[in-house]
Amino acid sequence: MATLLAPAFELPTSLHSLTNLADSRIGAQIVECSDDFFAEAKRMLQFEAPIFVEDKFDDHGKWMDGWETRRKRHAGYDWCIVKLGVAGKIKAVDIDTTFFTGNYPASASLEGCYAPNGNTQEALWQPLLGNSILGPSQHHVFDVQNDAIFTHIRLNIFPDGGVARLRIYGDVQIQITDTDQTLDLLALQNGGRVIAYSDAHFGHPRNLINPGRGVNMGDGWETKRRRAPGFDWCLLALGQAGKIEKIEIDTAHFKGNYPAQVSIQAIYIEDATDPQLIPQSMFWPFLLEAQDMQMDHIHSYLNEVLAHEKVSHIRVNMIPDGGISRVRLWGKVV
């Protein structure tokens, strides 16, 4: 059976610093849906791009990589409630109908609510996206104009059909109050985000804060081969400021292209805009001085971590170029 891969899609630059709050890897899950006869709704939340497997059928019909409902034979529409992986402010949504050509919904709308206790039935649902026309086998990226914090969303499709992927882009809003808990303060699920970078030719630095170890070399930050003096760098913001106790740098899958060294600079700063941080970052003090790297290896640093009472932003320097898979900053919220 031939397997078709989804066409490459370039995420709008404005969304690069946002988190997909509906990513199953950070805990997003289906709460309930009106129907998923042809394809389970949970497939819609997968991180991987959708595929199409020719001649693959199951007991319900053609296997599709997404959420697909049966043909509606009465008035109404289908819907699905999703618990976001983390609460956040929603800035944009991507309703992806890739490979749904004769079975995509005519239109869709989106609502959201804040229900930290999980009781969506008594929560106040707010409109996020009005009823919007959809097309066959394509991404549909819509801006959202609502500054509230949401824990759940409800996707409504009219009248029925299939959606390959649903991505909810926003800013994580998480307040960790347990100052005794050690956690990865840079992790995606804890609000870490990318601010800027020198190069991302082969892999984006947002992969550095993804959950788990990298699945392959593409699931990391990799720059082009440097032909001029200097080195590559990226700026990242912690979800909440904290005191760093341990650093992990993982070069998983990078074997002939890992950097010679990596160093990390850090600062605690309030009220600075992202563009202001870029030139300032060159002069930040070191949190971790340059360390030699090995291929396909987790490098752990305890005694090498330099004293900082509080860190809110870091600059990762990859010397001179190459690729790393993950960066973890273990510490406590201050």
UniProtKB/Swiss-Prot annotation:
Gene: alc
Enzyme class (EC, first level): hydrolase
GO biological process: allantoin catabolic process; purine nucleobase metabolic process
NCBIfam families (UniProt xref): allantoicase
InterPro entries associated with the record: Allantoicase, Allantoicase_dom, Galactose-bd-like_sf
Organism: Acinetobacter baylyi (strain ATCC 33305 / BD413 / ADP1)
Keywords: Hydrolase, Purine metabolism
Family, as annotated: Belongs to the allantoicase family.
Position of the signal peptide: none
Enzyme Commission designation: 3.5.3.4
PANTHER family: ALLANTOICASE, INACTIVE ALLANTOICASE-RELATED
One matching Pfam family: Allantoicase
The UniProt record lists the keyword Hydrolase: yes
Metabolic or biological pathway: Nitrogen metabolism; (S)-allantoin degradation; (S)-ureidoglycolate from allantoate (aminidohydrolase route): step 1/1
GO MF assignments: allantoicase activity
Record-given protein name: Probable allantoicase
Reactions accelerated catalytically: allantoate + H2O = (S)-ureidoglycolate + urea
Superkingdom of origin: Bacteria
